[in-house]
Amino acid sequence: MAQAPAHRAIVDASPWAGIFGTRIESARHYGRHWHATHGIGLVERGGHRSASGRGQVDAMAGDTIATNPGEVHDGRPLDATSRRWRMLYFEPGVLARWAGLQGVLELTRPAARDPVLARHLLRLFSRLDVWQASRTDLARLACDE
């Protein structure tokens, strides 16, 4: 029997209302699915290929990645190795409010080589890691419930 592809996913609560994070390292192929949130993230290692509402998207380590609420997409590694990425998911309306916009906000680049955005994401992930490390075991369990 074939061994299942390597996979590890962690969902992190956040101190920010309407936002949560994920850390994923996986060699799995994901079937078509969607999220009810905006997602903005960073590929940390390997490469990722997906079909999205904007066509085929390839993202390599250092690239930013994004999805819109309801956008159907899939995902798989670009080669036989796993890839690692982190995401921040924003409940609908959070990004628009931050940007001072009325109505719906759409992210138009599913993958990009954007060093400035990558640097800001790394800072946010770092702050989230510090916050996670400061939480008690009881607080972590309360979030998981």
What does each of the following model-derived ranges do?
Residues L101-E145:
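Amphipathic alpha-helical segments enriched in hydrophobic/aromatic residues interleaved with Lys/Arg
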Residues R8-E106:
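N-terminal regulatory/effector-sensing and dimerization cores
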